[in-house]
Amino acid sequence: MRLLLHLSVLIGLLGAAPRPARAQQPLEVVILAASHYNGSLAATYQPIIKKLRAYQPDMVFGEYLTAADAQALPATNQYQQAHQRRVSYLRRRALTTDPLTSRAAAAANRQLRRQPQLVRPRIDLARYYTFANDRGNAEYQLYLLEEPLKKNLTAADQAYYTQAMGPVDSLRKVRLVRPLTEYHKIIFPLLTEMGQAQLYGMDCQRYDEPWNEAYGQAITQNNALKAAFLIDSSTAQADTYRRMVATRTAYFAYLNQSDDDVEVYRLLNSPAYEKIDEALNFFGGEALYGAPGFPTEAVQEMRRQWVLRNQGMCDNVVRQARQQGARRVLVAVGASHGQTMRLLLQKMPNVQVRTFNDLP
């Protein structure tokens, strides 16, 4: 599928922050189960943005870590290692001055609320957020500079931008500009249209290590099943492998029902998708537990770590929404998280959950 969005006009980022309120006021969460690959032309996804904008969320969350959670990760974590590569990249740029302090960044944001068309404060903020391990907001500022504000850059602005951040090709290589993501194509344009200056992170990576261990065990057993199948396809284990392969076939057959990107998003947010996605991600899922040769224990451990991660994501959403006094929020998340987060949020007190498909 292909998704793309481009805004020709920047709408001022003036949105007022929600005010703190009672901790247990009713909270509504809309989940957008999104594709991580979005490669179509700009106008294609305006209907999705229009639908989300009509909902008027007080806050928008993305599948990024908060700066505090990211900074707390061990140096061996993949997310932390990627951050260190981005910091090293910035330190090699021509601009060698220190990034903004948190106080100066707050002042830059206040200035941009008054004058959202300014360019240099955004360059400084993009650099600040990158150093601070707030990847989501670094990418948001870079989206604004590369898309709606690009025409505003003078030659001097462009020179400063290159000194601070490097050429856009290099920014793509370090994955700070990712033109095909749901953020660049849908969420950042949505925030821009709504005048909201911040994307809130909610990912949880505390369970990354045990997840990877369980996944590695499952992959090893899956590969052994495949090797045995190629030798003898008549065994009970071979039948298990065929059932595992069938889940992948069913997954792609479901998504290939339509070439229309808006329709694909509807498919991603449907109960039918939740069922086949669960099977794909867990090597066939619960239906294969106990089947000959199936990595039952490893997959069960994967599932346990997956639920823990998604519970952490839900906790992050609800905690921050309560802190900000928000009454309705949008959560954009990879489609595989949609069902698990929905079920977990439904168990949380005073939280109502809707999906993208539930919106008018």
Which residues are covered by each model-predicted region?
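Extended, H/D-rich, highly charged conserved domains that either
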Residues: 152, 157-292
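A cross-kingdom marker for long, charged
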Residues: 31-33, 252-360
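Low-complexity, serine/threonine/proline-enriched polar segments
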Residues: 83-153, 233-282
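Second-shell loop/turn segments in exported
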Residues: 35-39, 171-180, 301-305
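A structural signal for short, well-ordered beta-strand segments and their strand-loop junctions
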Residues: 59-65, 196-204, 331-332
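A short acidic (Asp/Glu
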Residues: 41-43, 70-75, 210-214, 339-345
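Bacterial Sec-dependent N-terminal signal peptides
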Residues: 1-27
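Internal alpha/beta domain cores that form substrate/cofactor-binding pockets in large enzymes
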Residues: 24-130
